[in-house]
């Protein structure tokens, strides 16, 4: 890893005027100069788009119970469990018959 970059301890919170933000991944940059500025004269502004609805409204609702499509007369087809074993046995028998003939 480059000596100028290091992973910051994540996750962590940042408190701002707009609210509290959870930072999941961050990179700590070393040896970079800091430029002092006044907020009223700043030419670069970080824009944060606020969500249009509260988080509780955006979250999908959890199902209250497990829903199944049960058809009592219809059984679920299962794959034969001995298929792989039969395939190896047939291969073994074919090889043995070729060797003996």
Swiss-Prot record:
One of its GO terms (biological process) is symbiont-mediated suppression of host innate immune response. It holds the Pfam family Pox_F17. InterPro entries: Phosphoprotein_F17. Residues 56-68 have a biased composition (Basic and acidic residues). Its main location: virion. GO terms for cellular component: virion component. The modification Phosphoserine is found at residues 53, 62. It comes from the Viruses. Keywords: DNA-binding, Host-virus interaction, Inhibition of host innate immune response by virus, Late protein, Phosphoprotein, Viral immunoevasion, Virion. One of its GO terms (molecular function) is DNA binding. Phosphorylated on two serines. While these phosphorylations do not play a role in virion assembly; they are essential for the interaction with host RICTOR and RPTOR. It is found in: Virion. Self-associates to form high molecular-weight forms. Interacts with protein OPG157. Interacts with host RICTOR and RPTOR; these interactions disrupt the mTORC1 and mTORC2 crosstalk. Plays an essential role in virion assembly and morphogenesis. Also plays a role in the inhibition of host immune response by dysregulating mTOR. Sequesters host RICTOR and RPTOR, thereby disrupting mTORC1 and mTORC2 crosstalk. In turn, blocks the host antiviral response in part through mTOR-dependent degradation of cGAS, the primary poxvirus sensor. Belongs to the orthopoxvirus OPG062 family. This is Phosphoprotein OPG062. The gene is OPG062.
